[in-house]
Swiss-Prot record:
Function: Catalyzes the excision of an oxidatively damaged form of guanine (7,8-dihydro-8-oxoguanine = 8-oxoG) from DNA. Also cleaves the DNA backbone at apurinic/apyrimidinic sites (AP sites).
Keywords tagged on the record: DNA damage, DNA repair, Glycosidase, Hydrolase, Lyase, Multifunctional enzyme
Gene label: ogg
Higher taxonomy: Archaea, Thermoproteota, Candidatus Korarchaeia, Candidatus Korarchaeales, Candidatus Korarchaeaceae
Xref: SUPFAM superfamilies: DNA-glycosylase (SSF48150)
Protein name listed in UniProt: 8-oxoguanine DNA glycosylase/AP lyase
Organism annotation: Korarchaeum cryptofilum (strain OPF8)
Amino acid sequence: MGVDDLVNDVMRLKGSRVREIIERRMREFERERSDEELFKELVFCLLTANFSAEGGLRILESLGDGIFTLSEEELAAKLAELGHRYPRKRAEFIVEARKLIPILRDIISSFRDERLLREWLVKNVKGLGYKEASHFLRNIGFKNVSIIDYHILDLLMKYGILEEKPKSLSRARYLMIESILEEISRRTGINLGELDLYLWYIETGKVLK
């Protein structure tokens, strides 16, 4: 197995009902958002770091407006109660990120290149790595960054595209794996943001946020 096999499997899915579900999800990502909704997406991505997307979504929904109003201590207690693995750190990151609420939209629109915007997010938002910053950007409508999480790494291992699963992803390694996904993107005619949903489906049988 290798890149050719993965390309073929993606193309098969592209011709199935899964394509409709994925295209609908991509349209949802492109909708206009308020400043509060942008922050909510950012918090979702902070919650999913070293955690699961499903768990992050469940906790975000349970927190409600608490992401805007709770003190760091209250937020940490609530996150612990809801079962997050790193309640104190995530509470710290969320409270720290609140300062971005009034300026995040302007920061996003000031960048023409989404890769440079991703670099800015990684450097300036505590708790965001390349995976989380890419996830945030895809979820607000950007299409040319890859969300490389353990599901994607497992999939690339299964297809023999990666020889071993990296324990951690440095910037250089992240960009190297992203370049492999760019090749698959070119060959399938599917942008990176959408490709992530196809790969997630192949690995998990689900189309997630």
